[in-house]
Amino acid sequence: MRVALVSAVVLLGGCVYYNGVYNAKRLTHAAERAERDGRTIEARDYWAQVVVKADTVIARHPASSYVPEVQFLRARALGRMDQCGEAVPALRQALPAAPDSAAIEAGTFELARCLARLGDISAAADAYGQVIGARDPALRNEARFQYVHALRLSGRYAAALDAAANLADPRLPAERMVALAGAGRIPEAMTLIDSAVAHADTTAPWDSVLSAGGRRDPMAMSALVDRLVALPAATPAMKSRWLLEDGLRLMAHDSIRGDARLAEAAAAGPATEPAGRARLARAEQRLARARTSQDLALVVDTLEVLRDVPGARARAAMLADAATRVRAAADSAAAGAPRADLALFLAAETARDALAMPSLAGVLFRRLVEEQPGSPYAPKAVLALHQLDPEGVPDFPALLERYAASPYVAALHGEVGPGLRILEDSLSQFAATAGAASEGTPVAPEPAQPTAPGTRRPVEPR
């Protein structure tokens, strides 16, 4: 009787286990049918049930020989539910246990799709490339298109064009157009571009065409922008975006034309985010050319206006605050304010680091060296100048000799003594006090703490 009872329990457990595996497979097939029929919500529910059934089987029968297959079903279901962060490692682990070639192809396609969703486009292209010869016609055709698309997105334009050869997918002309432009085959790209423009197609991947082609022939792409902004269906935001990106590309070749393009972008869609970014870009160009306190004042006025403009708010506020600090420090140094050397050095650092204005930073560092040569921070300014532009400090060896006793010069030779820490602590405390004062916050003096010289940006001769 007892033996019979044990046998019955074992048999019942085996049935439950077998039913779990069977149901996971049945639900997988149901999910696939629902997807083919376009019942996406129902399919997603089936995939979720696959995960539940698979988890149950794995938890109750971890040593079963069927577990690898169930893990594969679970991994694929996770991918179909777009839980790609979990699906990718699960698929990579489970694919070797896929029951047949069709399952391997389906799982590999899902792996590629998830890699693309996670932004690993190069790996996605490689995975799609493994299933472009799949037996299932629907999967094969989609894999071939996605393979071309992933190659194009990863910048492998020549490979994308090779992969697209002899394919007839209606989505491919847009991919070819971008790939041809990116490969520098502009005349061939223009054949497809002309067709899309003639049909006033604003859904074509124009941003990608302009970006890829702009790296090869910025003038040809600039001429294309003129045609695109004339499309009847182009929205103000589209026009501003195309003009903005064109202006930024042109700045490297023709700053006058680039600035004119940015002005067009600002006017094309005044209330749009790209227009705000264009106005900010123009202000940043003026900021980069600033050399005096008066120059900064004019740009700060523009930046203050941009604080409330979409597309410019955060950066405009940061730049306005930094430029104001630089201007105030430069003016106070000119007026002979106490500790003007520290203020001038910090202003130069702000111009260099926060404003990305190396020319203005160089002017301020040199002012410190020339106007206050006895400052303990003059040697640090010399090193910063040399770091910015070695050719611009022809007297660098003589200056190093003049400041041979400076802790900063000693640090160049690896001699970090207490004098350097004291100077750096003093500079950091002054920076904190000045920053709090500009915000209206009182700062209580604190005892100096030992500070490693690397806590501020290191300055070393090149």
Language-model features: where?
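Acidic, polar-rich low-complexity tracts and alpha-helical solenoid repeat scaffolds
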Residues: V9-R462
